[in-house]
From Swiss-Prot:
EC number: 2.4.1.227
Subcellular location: Cell membrane
Name of protein: UDP-N-acetylglucosamine--N-acetylmuramyl-(pentapeptide) pyrophosphoryl-undecaprenol N-acetylglucosamine transferase
GO biological process per UniProt: carbohydrate metabolic process; cell division; cell wall organization; lipid glycosylation; peptidoglycan biosynthetic process; regulation of cell shape
Record membrane topology: Peripheral membrane protein
Pathway: Cell wall biogenesis; peptidoglycan biosynthesis
Pfam families the UniProt entry points to: Glyco_tran_28_C, Glyco_transf_28
Residues where UDP-N-acetyl-alpha-D-glucosamine binds: T25, G26, G27, R218, S248, Q362
InterPro entries in the record: GlcNAc_MurG, Glyco_trans_28_C, GlycoTrans_28_N
One GO location term (cellular component): plasma membrane
GO molecular function, one term: UDP-N-acetyl-D-glucosamine:N-acetylmuramoyl-L-alanyl-D-glutamyl-meso-2,6-diaminopimelyl-D-alanyl-D-alanine-diphosphoundecaprenol 4-beta-N-acetylglucosaminlytransferase activity
Species, as recorded: Roseiflexus sp. (strain RS-1)
Length: 439
């Protein structure tokens, strides 16, 4: 895509250029978009502990930034960035850094070399001051090129367990950030809370490598009005609301289970169901059509919901359904356990029944919330039992019929929230720029 021209400040000096790099899943894209918003806010304030004097102090920087999103050729991130932001986007060749088939591996290495060359040329032309990577194959060629061009980098690990690309890039990056301290044992690094890391970073201490920032989410999650969010979906005050979501690509096993359970669930609740764009809406609509009309009205089906709220309605209230509005409106969620649950569910204090997708380390994300009393977990295999004796129905029924337990889970979830995570990552980018300028 064609890049937009870098805007200039009134004094004639261009803002610093930041690259936000990531792709493959929404869990890699949404954190980058949240950091873009923080950079655009010109250094929102937050408080860190003064480890020397035992006092708290406000940290604020007001560097002006201009951001470019860098994704992979043919990746899902291009459409997602276009829908959710106004950021310019540039696509680079990228591929997996491993493969079982020797021929595929050779092709991937050629693609990696092409991507690294393209990234190096783009760096020379665009001159980024710092680069944030949030995961995905596209980070590899960008970070290799950045290393050659001496551009400072931060790699951010959204999930508890890092993928191969992040484990490799953690060795190249100037700083590594993570959502939760549990990631440290997988990266072979000692995690340091952001508040404790700041004084050491300011003194050019290079021994601090892994910094716990939390998972960055849009600030609207912390400020959205629950009553307004429920109104935009037309929800009743007399029934609890279940949010069903499978992540940025949907979740067929969850969708099929919910379709089978609709006759049992809808007499007890309203459902907001974000099913994804893989065609599952067809069988879900068929399942709802055979139910009585009064139950059909309790089912709100969407293939996709934009993340950012539209507040163009009267009195600044949400005027259209959005994912943020759905999260705030719900009393309980049923969802996968991609990286976003580590930030979004705590931000709104939403208890959840988590059904991790197998094979991609979602179990560890789920376990993080389950062990802290903010969620319960059912296996993907258990979703096949779509009777009222099945694990999914029993978990939903128990939690929606026990407001006290839901409230306790909500409080424990909110205790895990990191409202300043995006600002912290923005602060790390600025710290690297200052380091380079004063080196």
């Amino acid at each position: 895509m064609k890049q937009s021209r870098i805007p200039r400040d009134p004094d004639g000096l261009p803002p610093l250029r930041a690259w936000l790099v990531g792709g493959g899943t929404g869990g890699h894209v949404y954190p980058a978009l949240a950091v873009a918003a923080a950079l655009n806010a010109h250094g929102a304030q937050f408080v860190v502990a003064d480890t020397d004097g035992g006092r708290n102090r406000a940290m604020s920087r007001h560097t002006r930034w201009s951001a470019l999103y860098v994704g992979s050729v043919g990746g899902m991130e291009a459409a997602l960035v276009a829908r959710e932001s106004a950021l310019p986007f540039h696509a680079l060749p990228a591929a997996a850094v491993r493969g079982r088939n020797p021929l595929t591996m050779v092709r991937n290495l050629i693609t990696l070399a092409r991507g690294t060359g393209a990234a190096h040329r783009l760096i020379a032309r665009d001159r980024p001051a710092a680069i944030l990577g949030t995961g995905g194959y596209v980070c590899v060629p960008v970070f290799l090129a950045a290393r050659l061009a001496c551009v400072p980098t931060v790699i951010y690990q959204p999930d508890v367990v890092p993928g191969l690309a992040v484990r490799l890039l953690a060795r190249l990056a100037n700083l590594v950030a993570c959502s939760v301290a549990d990631s440290g044992r997988y990266l072979g690094l000692t995690p340091v809370d952001f508040e404790r890391a700041v004084p050491q970073l300011e003194t050019q201490n290079r021994t601090v490598r892994l910094i716990v920032t939390g998972y960055p989410v849009r600030q609207e999650l912390f400020h959205a009005d629950r009553r307004a969010c429920r109104a935009v979906f037309g929800l009743s005050d007399d029934l609890p609301t279940l949010l069903v979501a499978g992540g940025s690509r949907g979740a067929r096993s969850i969708n099929r289970a919910i379709a089978a359970l609709l006759p049992s669930l809808l007499p007890l609740m309203e459902i907001i169901h974000v099913c994804g764009r893989e065609g599952d809406a067809t069988f879900l609509r068929a399942a709802i059509r055979v139910l009585p009309e009064n139950l059909q009205k309790r089912y709100h089906l969407f293939e996709y919901l934009h993340s950012a709220p539209d507040i163009s309605g009267q009195e600044g209230l949400p005027s259209t359904p959005t994912m943020i509005a759905a999260l705030v409106a719900a009393d309980l969620a049923v969802c996968r356990s991609g990286a976003s649950i580590l930030g979004e569910l705590p931000a709104v204090g939403l208890p959840a029944v988590l059904a991790p997708y197998p094979y991609v380390h979602q179990d560890e994300n789920a376990d993080y919330l389950v062990q802290r009393g903010a969620a319960v977990k059912v296996s993907d295999a258990a979703l096949a039992d779509t009777t009222e004796k099945g694990s999914l129905f029993r978990a939903i029924y128990r939690l929606l019929n026990c407001p006290e337990e839901r409230r306790a889970m909500a409080e424990r979830a909110r205790a895990l929230a990191q409202p300043d995570a995006a600002q912290k990552l923005a602060f790390l980018l600025e710290t690297l720029v200052i380091r380079r300028q004063t080196a």
